[in-house]
């Protein structure tokens, strides 16, 4: 995606220490130069999707901590499901960091309707109430418990990404300056 990916800690973790963990296996490999590179494969770890709904004590959750929720290979349906959980677990604060704020800016308009259409008619999501899902109400959207950020590695990346971040509906926006 950018120069900021050259020494990615997440790729290094996935290619070394986490390479035998089923949720990370095959997502990154070491190349001939000894650099960790993602393979381009994306994976939806559905077994953990409802975990925030089960946690009672409020937490700060880094969504897709070792990946990018707005990667081009991540289907909108996966993102819809993740946002539905965030809507249903408003006691937690969810932080999303992306190098692709242009996709977030294009994706987020209409999110409330998509989630409501998919889940709003349901009283429960699995065993959990979806009391946080409201249809296009100013009080609920953007979700007050979701922070959206972009990572930037230099001024050019900041100039390219920050305008998309600022144009994206979010309760809290942030910038992560990374080498």
Residue spans for each PLM region:
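Conserved hydrophobic/aromatic pocket- or pore-lining residues that grip, position, or stack substrates
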Residues: 96, 148, 165
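Conserved Radical SAM active-site core
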Residues: 1-145, 155-157
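Histidine/lysine/aspartate-rich catalytic loop segments that bind and position anionic ligands
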Residues: 152-154, 158, 166-179
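Long, well-ordered alpha-helical scaffolding segments within enzyme catalytic domains
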Residues: 78-86, 163-170, 175
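Structural motif
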Residues: 62-63, 149, 176
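Proline-centered loop/turn at the N-terminus of a beta-strand
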Residues: 93, 147, 172-174
């Amino acid at each position: 995606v950018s120069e900021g990916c050259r020494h990615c800690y997440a790729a290094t973790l996935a290619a070394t220490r986490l390479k035998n963990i089923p949720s990370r296996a095959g997502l990154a490999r070491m190349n001939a130069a000894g650099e960790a590179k993602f393979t381009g494969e994306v994976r939806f770890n559905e077994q953990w999707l409802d975990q925030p709904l089960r946690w009672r004590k409020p937490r700060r959750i880094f969504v897709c901590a070792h990946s990018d929720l707005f990667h081009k290979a991540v289907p909108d349906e996966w993102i819809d499901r993740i946002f539905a959980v965030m809507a249903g677990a408003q006691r937690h604060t969810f932080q999303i960091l992306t190098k692709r704020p242009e996709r977030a800016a294009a994706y987020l308009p209409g999110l409330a309707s998509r989630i409501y259409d998919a889940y709003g008619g349901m009283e429960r999501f699995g065993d959990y109430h979806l009391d946080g899902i409201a249809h296009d109400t100013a009080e609920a959207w953007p979700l007050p418990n979701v922070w959206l950020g972009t990572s930037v590695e230099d001024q050019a990346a900041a100039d390219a990404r920050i305008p998309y971040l600022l144009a994206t509906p979010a309760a809290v926006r942030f910038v992560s300056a990374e080498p």
